[in-house]
Amino acid sequence: MTRFADWLETTPAWLIGLILVAAMFGASLLGEWLKRRTSTAKGDDEEGGREGYIVSATLGLLALLMGFTFSLAVDRFEARRLLVLEEANAIGTTYLRTQMLEPVDRARISKMLVDYTDNRILLAKAPLDQIPALLAKNDQMLTDLWTATLAAWPSIKGLDFSSSYLETMNNMIDLDSARKAARLARVPSAVFFVLFVYVITSAGVLGYAGANKEGRGATAFLFLLLAISLLLTLDIDRPRSGRITESQAPMERLRATLASQPPEVFDRMSAPKATATPAAPP
């Protein structure tokens, strides 16, 4: 099953679609051939009625299985989409609270958060061959962020917001793990394998029931619809290589906000530091 999962992940969707349609046509022709070999002149009407029930039941079960698989894929897609928004909010909150640190720590961590946001956006859109390097850079950035937080801790540990700042930074780091887990949470490959087998078997049942006699054009159209439905489900379940992926708009809006709000922006309402006035000579 691991090989099948790898094949689903690495094979282009259009090629999977061609193979699936060809397999359905082959199964349909095989079913038609078996029908001719086993059919008898007597009792055709009664047998045709039984075949109609079998075809209806087969297609009904196929619709149920495809709907179940599509629901699994959409649920996982929605979870990934919500995590993007949560992470953008967490990074933004951390950035704002960073402005309360000492100037040196504030400048350093603010710059690191901007770079981290850039890398997160690249990581979500990168092709498969670039992901390992970006992941390694991502993990190193998180280590550096926590190291910088520890360096800033002595200057804030006595302040009221120190605990909430640590909590915010921890939450941001935890969301990195949550997004990684969400991208690995896929529809089990065994479900897709059973679905592929069932689709091909259903095509064979249709061929045996004489669907090809009604016109191969209609049969081809049905097979095309089934293949498109299955490929849509498969594409939604491909967070790295699919065309339908979770939007990075929250992260991109955050990046634009960070670019427009460097640390110096937050100093414009601060009271100027009082300068010592030299004492008048006696």
Residues of each region from the PLM?
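Structured inter-helical modules in multipass membrane proteins
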Residues: T94-R183
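Short, solvent-exposed mixed-charge patches
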Residues: A280-P282
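Short extracytoplasmic/periplasmic juxtamembrane "stem" segments immediately C-terminal to an N-terminal membrane anchor
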Residues: V84-M100, S247-Q261
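Alpha-helical transmembrane anchor segments
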Residues: E9-S39, A181-P272
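Hydrophobic alpha-helical segments
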Residues: M1-T10
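A generic, lipid-embedded transmembrane alpha helix
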Residues: G52-F70
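Transmembrane signal-anchor/signal-peptide helices with a preference for the extracytoplasmic
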Residues: L64-L85, D237-R238
